[in-house]
Amino acid sequence: MGQSVSAIRRVSRLRRHARLRKRIAGTQQRPRLVVHRSARHIHVQLVNDANGTTVAAASSIETDVRGLDGDKKARSVRVGQLIAERAKAADIDTVVFDRGGYTYGGRIAALADAARENGLKF
């Protein structure tokens, strides 16, 4: 017997993320925009890998995002807007996008597009 399909997909995603992390790293001027997607929520952080700190974060668990009507993609758009606002407050305008091994589509693309529309460059 082999592994379940969901276990294989998870391991494959983690391998993709490990390959991606070999090539990218965040700095003070250009932090890494890290995305984590679960079945229900989406989380995003700006990480400075030089000293291992989180500069800013946003999530669909926050109360102003939870109250939104609509689907998960609409919440992802709002999270993208929030992280762009918080990055501006921290004087950050350019980031390195780390999609976490997830395919660039759906909620991940919606979050990235919303962050770009609100002033983040990547």
UniProtKB/Swiss-Prot annotation:
Function in brief: This is one of the proteins that bind and probably mediate the attachment of the 5S RNA into the large ribosomal subunit, where it forms part of the central protuberance.
GO terms for MF: 5S rRNA binding; structural constituent of ribosome
Protein name: Large ribosomal subunit protein uL18
Subunit description: Part of the 50S ribosomal subunit; part of the 5S rRNA/L5/L18/L25 subcomplex. Contacts the 5S and 23S rRNAs.
Pfam families the record matches: Ribosomal_L18p
Source organism superkingdom: Bacteria
Disulfide bond listed as a keyword: no
Organism: Mycobacterium ulcerans (strain Agy99)
GO BP, sorted A to Z: translation
Family, similarity comment: Belongs to the universal ribosomal protein uL18 family.
Keywords associated with the record: Ribonucleoprotein, Ribosomal protein, RNA-binding, rRNA-binding
GO cellular component: cytosolic large ribosomal subunit
InterPro entries given in the database record: Ribosomal_uL18_bac-type, Ribosomal_uL18_bac/euk
Record carries keyword Ribosomal protein: yes
